[in-house]
Amino acid sequence: IDENYRTKKTRKNTFIGGSSCGGLMSLYASYAYSNIYSKAIVVSPYILESMDAILNDINHQNIQKNTSIYLSWGSNETSLMHEFVWQTKACTSVGNALSKKGVKVFYNVIPDGRHCEEDWEKECDTFLPFLVL
């Protein structure tokens, strides 16, 4: 990318983002490669199945200072309320572990937010300014 486009190559100007599994991968990249990425957009990550591994991984990482993560999920991603509660617990547990490592975590629970591109698109006005804060 840097060879073909005008870019700012510094960590401060290098971000990653994704939704669903892409959100999970962006979350991982944000702490495992914090020497490259300064900010991550993590939208509707499905972390329930891998939460213990993620928490263990975070605890063993040396995360760069000035790392920030926008972490969001919707209240209506599934039709089951208990899954929303589990997702909230998982996201806040991961966010708290990152905060303990010095990461700035910005949470955003989307009322009636579903697990779909149509709803994620509506978040652009919220998470894009986060990148330039």
Language-model region placement:
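Non-catalytic cap/lid and distal C-terminal segments of serine-dependent acyl enzymes
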Residues: 1-133
